[in-house]
């Protein structure tokens, strides 16, 4: 007897990203949320907080997650709030004047490589003092308008949150990051597909997706190696 194996029940996995619809009148908020410039500019963080203070706290002060969480009705109501709209336009004008300034071409260009960057608690790609220092370097380079780019890694499980056990011992809680709700954007190739870079290592290649973090004027490229094609040892 010959038995044929059917693939009818084999799942066909596809990645789908669902985003909330931001009214055209509030698109400036979305653009600013995707640049970590807000992390060291209090006018911007205060603006996002005042959109909905309760939700702002619930999403951990993450502007991207905040805009995704707000209901359509809430967003429509904000378009009619003249105070919020004026504040948004004022902050956006400062933001655009800042990011559109051209770097001094007389100074050397800099490529900065680091394993971790402490830019904001929202983006957990750091673990200690080295990362915080590297993050400050990028922010200062942005404020000084240095022609710099950063290179690093994107981690699914970044820095942990701490809690205490009943006997007073520290517990490290590692939470998986939802990349779709972070101030990062995936880099696409010329065919509109996620860019993959191949890095030779020992006797095989490590494949990595590339994501971009806008740190004010400084672009930070981070690679992510957690691909299905890899053995577990190649995952970050």
Residue ranges: model-predicted function:
Residues 2-101:
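Extended, charge-enriched "interface" segments that sit outside catalytic cores
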Residues 104-121:
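Structured, charged N-terminal subsegments at the starts of enzyme catalytic cores
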Residues 114, 150-154, 224:
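Glycine-rich, histidine-containing beta strand-loop boundary motifs that form or position
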Residues 117-122, 155-161, 228:
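Flexible loop/turn segments at secondary-structure boundaries
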Residues 120, 124-147, 151:
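A conserved hydrophobic secondary-structure block that centers on an alpha-helix together
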Residues 142-160, 164, 171-174:
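Hydrophobic or amphipathic alpha-helical targeting/insertion segments
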Residues 167-211:
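Extended, Lys/Arg-enriched charged tracts that mediate electrostatic binding to polyanionic substrates
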Residues 225-232:
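Conserved small/polar residues in nucleotide/adenosyl-binding loops
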């Amino acid at each position: 007897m010959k038995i044929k194996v059917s693939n009818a029940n084999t799942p066909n996995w596809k990645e789908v990203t669902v985003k909330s619809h931001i009214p055209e009148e509030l698109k400036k908020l979305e653009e600013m949320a995707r640049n970590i410039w807000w992390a060291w500019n209090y006018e911007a963080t205060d603006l996002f907080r005042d959109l909905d203070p309760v939700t702002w706290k619930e999403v951990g002060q993450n502007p991207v997650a905040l805009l995704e969480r707000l209901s359509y009705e809430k967003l429509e109501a904000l378009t009619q709030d003249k105070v919020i709209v004026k504040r948004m336009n004022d902050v956006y004008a400062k933001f655009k004047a800042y990011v559109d300034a051209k770097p001094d071409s007389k100074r050397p260009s800099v490529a900065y490589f680091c394993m971790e960057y402490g830019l904001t608690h929202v983006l957990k790609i750091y673990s200690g003092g080295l990362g915080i220092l590297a993050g400050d370097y990028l922010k200062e380079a942005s404020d000084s308008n240095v022609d710099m780019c950063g290179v690093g890694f994107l981690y699914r499980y970044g820095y942990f949150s701490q809690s205490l056990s009943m006997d007073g011992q520290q517990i490290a809680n590692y939470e998986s990051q939802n990349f779709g709700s972070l101030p990062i954007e995936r880099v696409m190739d010329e065919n509109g597909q996620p860019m993959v870079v191949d890095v030779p290592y020992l006797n095989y290649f490590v494949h990595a997706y590339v994501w971009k973090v806008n740190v004010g004027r400084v672009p930070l490229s981070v690679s992510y190696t957690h691909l299905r094609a890899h053995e577990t040892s190649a995952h970050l």
